[in-house]
Amino acid sequence: MRTNPTTSSPVVSTLEEKNLGRIAQIIGPVLDVVFPPGKMPNIYNALVVKGRDTVGQQINVTCEVQQLLGNNRVRAVAMSATDGLMRGMEVIDTGAPLSVPVGGATLGRIFNVLGEPVDNLGPVDTRTTSPIHRSAPAFIQLDTKLSIFETGIKVVDLLAPYRRGGKIGLFGGAGVGKTVLIMELINNIAKAHGGVSVFGGVGERTREGNDLYMEMKESGVINEKNIAESKVALVYGQMNEPPGARMRVGLTALTMAEYFRDVNEQDVLLFIDNIFRFVQAGSEVSALLGRMPSAVGYQPTLSTEMGSLQERITSTKEGSITSIQAVYVPADDLTDPAPATTFAHLDATTVLSRVLAAKGIYPAVDPLDSTSTMLQPRIVGEEHYETAQRVKQTSQRYKELQDIIAILGLDELSEEDRLTVARARKIERFLSQPFFVAEVFTGSPGKYVGLAETIRGFQLILSGELDGLPEQAFYLVGNIDEATAKAMNLEVESKLKK
């Protein structure tokens, strides 16, 4: 049974209804709390510790019940630092799970795991809240139709298309354009689909979170002058926060996204960076709760925890949540339980290549390593499928020939191979694209390219109709007509120089 959003405050409202307990034990971020007989809180209930420490500083710590131990004792995990807490302090059972603000008022704001704004812009203008623990939509509510989620980014739409309501793994190291790609997707979904985005920073570096916020303001994704016109809500649980906060911040972001899908009936883009740190935080909490570790030291409940998050990310008859998740692979070991469990849920993978980024090809999406379960003739159609396969075959052949070219040069290749290389280099450059969010850096206007235009462009390159055009004409353009126009301009410029 799904819990509907309510207009009640997450804070305990009436003093007489308080269910009070006392702290019996503190082990780092884990508290044992004793309640009166018959007054035990439920699993996942939020507990609040209020008071003052030994030097008179105000304490306000929210915890979540994880285990019922018997003898009227529960074990809870704190969502913030437990500094200053002492045995015997009073604990209030709120009688409900953690609830966070939802709705349009969350756009343009930054929240912590508890749904509290942390951007110094004052309180959130909404009384509608929703619990972070909810069941996944029932089968009868799901939209089982397989449909492509058009992003307007050529390389993604052609070679590794996203599924509407699907989950995409984003693999990329530092400095290859991951943040810019994320911001462009946020911008494009707002323009083309009228949708909104939610960004969940799970175990992020504080600096990275701050940089993302500043870049979003600079590019207009967050509108400083009119915050209500912003296209994204941000939820951060940084590296320095307790494992409880890092474990639950993904659910906070997902709950905000669910409201836009279920109530506003919108298409939502949910970013989780990094899904590995969600697993890592769960592993820390599991050890603190005294559970026996499983393979490679991970929690025994790894699959259950991952499933409870991922199954809520789906398409319903009202709208969809399409999730893009950054995936860190420990020691590049794809068999590690954390990434292996994540892969089982993914519909597509977008791999960013440092080699392409070094060449200046942006977005630096690797056309051969990126995959999608949606790239099938019965889903995307024969024309799209055939074009994508031919683009991949040409790129693969070019990759195989690169060693020969490096040693012997282009002249030693056969006529057919030289033609393949020329077309592959045009394809490589045509897969680049000017982004709207990068306009402030490049000075070039951004381009949204529809799927039909993308397919037409690559078909013309593969057919040989554009063999006479210089390869630089295909670099950082939108559709194929722009490449043709750019080639004419280059020709005029070269004549003028002569």
UniProtKB/Swiss-Prot annotation:
* Highest taxon, organism lineage: Eukaryota
Question: Which Gene3D superfamilies does its entry note?
Answer: 2.40.10.170, Bovine Mitochondrial F1-atpase, Atp Synthase Beta Chain, Chain D, domain 3 (1.10.1140.10), P-loop containing nucleotide triphosphate hydrolases (3.40.50.300)
- Which residues are noted in the entry as ATP-binding? 172-179
The record, for PROSITE patterns, names: ATPASE_ALPHA_BETA
PANTHER family associated with the record: ATP SYNTHASE (PTHR15184), ATP SYNTHASE SUBUNIT BETA, MITOCHONDRIAL (PTHR15184:SF71)
Signal sequence extent: none
- Gene Ontology CC: one annotated term: chloroplast thylakoid membrane
Task: Describe the function of this protein.
Answer: Produces ATP from ADP in the presence of a proton gradient across the membrane. The catalytic sites are hosted primarily by the beta subunits.
What is the name listed in the Swiss-Prot or TrEMBL entry for this protein?
A: ATP synthase subunit beta, chloroplastic
Q: Give a GO molecular function annotation for the protein.
A: proton-transporting ATP synthase activity, rotational mechanism
